[in-house]
């Protein structure tokens, strides 16, 4: 008992879905979405998380240094060759090598 494939150009009968939402859609058609729990229930923040707000009095003196801006680095006093001086040196080397060969 072998089935013959349909002729070329004929769409199968089960190719397109039925009109309307799927049968297993959530929520079922005609019913609203369930109410969400907002605002969060009492007892928030959850156990294990500290409450939000200002730090307690004396917080910086508990062994941690107070944070601030890092110290600025002083500019180097040595004069390093600039890009222009490097390009001139490379051009001179090119001219010398071109004249030699």
UniProtKB/Swiss-Prot annotation:
It is found in: Membrane. Residues 59-77 have a biased composition (Low complexity). GO terms for cellular component: membrane. The chain crosses the membrane at residues 78-95. Pfam families: CYSTM. Residues 24-43 have a biased composition (Pro residues). Residues 1-80 are annotated as: Disordered. It is a single-pass membrane protein. Keywords: Membrane, Transmembrane, Transmembrane helix. Belongs to the CYSTM1 family. This is Cysteine-rich and transmembrane domain-containing protein B.
